[in-house]
Amino acid sequence: MKLLVLDGNSLVNRAFFGIKVLTTKDGRFTNAIYGFMNILLNLLKAHEPDEVAIAWDLKAPTFRHKMYDGYKATRHGMPPELAQQMPVLKQLLADLGFVSVSCEGWEADDILGTLAAACAARKDDCLLATGDRDSLQLASETTTILLATNKETIPMDPQAVREKYGVEPRQLIEVKSLMGDSSDNIPGVAGIGEKTALMLVQNFGTLDGVYAHIDDPRIKPGMRAKLNAHKAEAELSRTLGTIVCEAPIETAPGSYARQPGDPAAAAKLLSELEIQTLIPRLGLTEAKAAPRRELPVHAAEAMPLLAEGDYYVAMRPATTKKEGVHNVIDTPSCWYAVQNEQVFALEEARLTTLLDDAAVRLHAFDSAPLYAMAFAAGGEGKSICEDGKLAAYLLNPSARDYLVSTLADAYGIEGEFACPEFPDAGLLIPLMQRMNAQVDQQGMRKLMDEIEFPLAQVLADMTHTGVLVDEEGIRSFGEMLRTELEGCLDRIYEAVGYEFNLNSPKQLGEALFDKLGLPPRKKTRSGYSTDAETLESLQNYSPVVSDILQYRLYQKLNSTYVEGLLKVIGPDGRIHSNFLQTEARTGRLSSTEPNLQNIPIRTELGSRMRAFFVAPEGCELVDADYSQIELRLLAHASGDEAMREAFLQGRDIHRSTAAKMYHIPDEEVTPALRSSAKAINFGIMYGKGAFSLSRDLGISVKEADAFLKNYLDTFPGVDGYMRSTIADAKEKGYVSTLFGRRRALPELSSTNFQVRSGGERMARNTPIQGTAADIIKLAMVRVWRRLRAEGMQSRLILTVHDELIVEAPEAEAARAAEILQHEMEHCVNYSVPLSVEAKIGRNWLQAH
């Protein structure tokens, strides 16, 4: 028999703090529940236990509290955001049939120990899942600790404990008696840390052994004095740190077998929590009202009989029998259309003929693949009249997914009819109608009709057109990078004196700090930190550090961009990136295959990557880029006179900022002052405080704080705007862009300072960054339409951050540049005008 025991409090805390804030539409927190259930499901899948027990701490004091008043006295209370999830999680586990166990006066650790001891007596296998290293003392021939870390779950048996710590599992009690435990406020011996404690136990076996050999020369005088002064604390700590294996709980076989529970209640609760993705993984069926009737599916050939009017079109979710989300149907069609309570199975070929049919209006749940079909067939998708997924995105940009079934559950929609072949068919029309009404109620109709929906067609056309790349140039660049990589490696190995795995932070740390003796800056759990910030601070100590930084740059460019680009070049020599419209919470676009937003530009080598995006023979690339759009929007939104005046007079905003702050003429502003002003201009917008700014500028926190205060005194309109934005967001629960795009910020109501501060940063940044995203999207729609209206061959092919790139025949390039500049600058009429610079070149680097 195999028993799995979960340390409930330890794992739920790890889930809560390890997963970003998740809430339901009505503001209930769910991240701890979602994370804990994922941990449980992964453990069940990996280990297939016969029985499962979930151990919980109780609020009542334990025997350890009675023994030592200071026990766990320094711990903060449970965050309210977690506390409100605990009873819900326990109810969910009960509904699922899992047995929870707790015992007044005893801790969950003692329950783990008691169950492990019972299994050992029967020679049964026991698995203890926890994030607490205290449980490692329980590892035995029958008990394995499944230690949850930030990245993985590590199985720790006695041999693994010996290899990591150099002592037996039970000797970890002796180690803790010496080093103490700050998290539990166990005192130990003041001045003795883990390294010294391990050395003492490795040499003398136990705490008693240490004191029996207190005069041993291996115990230095200073250490001896500490041990003698704190012997009582050490003995107390040993008692406090020992897990007791005799808690009065059920231990008989069968006590923790899974019970029938209430699967329907569990499914209902998960639906209410908007965690529907767990329902199929738990083998549950979503609770739905009985349908009024079951409708048949008409074959595609029936479509000509009704080939006019309005159809609601969606794709059947890809599923398998194992996943159990939907039944798998014996039909090649994955598309369906609903009209007048009739459901039609659509082959892609038949669907394609409808995409530009003037007699029909297609209400698409997701228009992106439909537009892709249309452009591939030489059309434009003129029959598509709306997009339900975009409506769902506008209403909740933080949603985990935008599936019809998930959204219907969230809105409490139950279909009026059933269709076994297409289970979502009965939900589609009422769902889209409900979301359309919500878009209207929340004032986002103009945002949908003038920006988001028309943009879907533009993006599909851009993907279809693609951008030509210089494949040979990319390959040659890759060869050069590999040569440079080899040179870096040779110099690094020569400086260190031996070869090692440069991609291993542990081995690199040993080479730099142990072998070369460089001063370590900070340590991680696995050893010395070798992150970029650390290495950059060490460049003056040894030339090898610069070689390591260069090695990382070359490796990143080669693996991510050279090899990454070569993999996605199509037969036509072009890259057809997928533009994602419903990913970023601020409304910004992203892209995949490749991620064009991450094409590097900050280094000379990285910027050379742009040279490989080229125009075909007889054409040129036209690149138009907004100048400081977010700062211009900040000046407009805040109404700050000094900032507005600088832009209206065409002055360098960063130079002008420095001049205003230090009361000097623009011409006396030094490069250093301008750089500081630039950092503050952008830092204010992104909610940076004095600490972050001090790191950006390489100054003290005190100096950075003075800079910030001076800035806010100089631009009081900005300060007032930021304060009012946060206050408004706290009152409403969301922030809006100037176009009305909303982003809910439940973080603002958190009692956790870090979570709340993060929410305030998002409140400052989202209205400006989101408005910039809205503007670039609107500009794309206007440019795309203008090029077609003038009958030009020029095509919009790329967007990266605040840039738009058009591929134009040489004869049209100048006109394309004029159109880009005009449409981008005039798509809004704000108190601070937008500024765009357009350039022409044979490749992206030349045009930028």
What is each residue range found by the language model?
Residues 49-53, 98, 121, 140-144, ...:
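Non-catalytic nucleic-acid-binding/docking modules located in mid-to-C-terminal regions
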